[in-house]
């Protein structure tokens, strides 16, 4: 499996990152099977978050790592400071509280990658970067990033860090997929647009894409007259996306692969380092993702797929 480098980590990060938002204690045997298969096929990075499944995602990963005694072999990406019913929580106190609980659940003294799950533009980047750097200095975090931040805020944060001798963000985690959303899938989410991608190309900051396959838009399970999934209709149903689906299917036929594999290859063939968060729940889905990650697309093919 191909890898990318992220500043602050000695270990490389595989370009397929196993998602865990379906991990619960009730399906722990499935969790073990998914993670064992993922490592067996060459993956090493697991995505989770403080809010996933009320903490069960982190807890099951922690249990699995302890039972396998393999903490040093995996890269953990967890996220915190997500808003709650009372509003935004991107502040030093919430970051510290979430991180402490996350590490306890993971049964680890540190996380390799830590991302703020959302942004709060009312909080100065100085406050945020100072707080995160305290945790880096204490050894609780190896590398920091931001999920669902605009590239303008990322640049502002890294400019502040550079000017003040601090560690900056070494990765970003917005949504990036071939299907372009009509509106955010969830409140406060950011999807990488043309300007965001241009910024990543300029800075070469790694992008770890969530929902990289657009919620299954390219599986063949959706069509303009199939309206039963209200969220998919709201977020992804558009004339441009149906044309992107048609083009992906055409290119897939030419290359002898599946349409959804083309959609994954699109994410992994950008002009900057990328990795895709995947939700594989069995061996067949995992192998499909690995095959998709090995597809080479030319710059012209990427341009043709996305520009309608």
Q: Language-model segments: what does each one mean?
A:
Residues 1-9, 59-69, 98-104, 158-162, ...:
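Short amphipathic alpha-helices and their capping/turn segments at secondary-structure boundaries
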Residues 1-74, 137:
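N-terminal binding-site loop/beta-alpha segment at the start of enzyme catalytic domains
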Residues 27-31, 57-60, 91, 124-128, ...:
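Residues at alpha-helix caps and immediate loop-helix transition turns in enzyme cores, especially N-
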Residues 26-38, 90-106, 155-159:
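Short, acidic/polar
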Residues 125-307:
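Beta/alpha (TIM)-barrel catalytic core signal, keyed to glycine-rich beta->alpha loops juxtaposed to Asp/Glu
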Residues 14-18, 46-48, 76-78, 111-116, ...:
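Hydrophobic faces of well-ordered beta-strands that scaffold small-molecule active sites
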Residues 103-124:
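Active-site groove signature of glycoside hydrolases
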């Amino acid at each position: 499996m191909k890898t990318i480098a992220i500043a602050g980590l000695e270990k490389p990060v595989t370009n397929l990152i196993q998602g865990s938002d379906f991990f619960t204690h009730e399906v722990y045997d499935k969790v073990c099977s998914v993670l064992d298969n993922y490592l067996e096929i060459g993956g090493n990075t697991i995505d989770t978050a403080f809010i996933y499944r009320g903490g069960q995602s982190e807890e099951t990963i922690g249990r699995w790592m302890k039972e396998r005694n393999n903490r040093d072999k995996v890269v953990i990406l967890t996220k915190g400071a997500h808003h709650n019913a009372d509003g935004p929580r991107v502040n030093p106190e919430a970051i510290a509280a979430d991180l402490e609980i996350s590490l306890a659940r993971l049964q680890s003294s540190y996380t390799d990658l830590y991302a703020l799950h959302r942004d709060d533009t009312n909080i100065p980047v100085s406050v945020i970067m100072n707080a995160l750097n305290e945790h880096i200095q204490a050894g609780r975090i190896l590398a920091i990033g931001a999920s669902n931040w605009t590239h303008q805020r990322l640049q502002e944060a890294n400019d502040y860090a550079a000017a003040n001798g601090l560690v900056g963000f070494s990765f970003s985690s917005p949504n990036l997929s071939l299907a372009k959303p009509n509106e955010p899938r969830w409140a406060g989410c950011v999807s990488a647009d043309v300007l965001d991608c241009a910024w990543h190309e300029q800075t070469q900051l790694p992008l770890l894409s969530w929902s990289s396959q657009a919620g299954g838009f390219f599986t063949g399970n959706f069509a303009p007259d199939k309206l039963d999934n209200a969220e998919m209709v709201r977020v992804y149903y558009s004339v441009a996306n149906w044309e992107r689906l048609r083009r992906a299917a055409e290119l897939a036929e030419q290359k002898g692969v599946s349409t959804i594999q083309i959609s994954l290859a699109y994410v992994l063939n950008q002009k900057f380092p990328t990795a895709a968060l995947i939700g594989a729940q069995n061996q067949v889905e995992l192998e499909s993702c690995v095959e998709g990650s090995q597809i080479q697309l030319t710059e012209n093919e990427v341009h043709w797929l996305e520009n309608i």
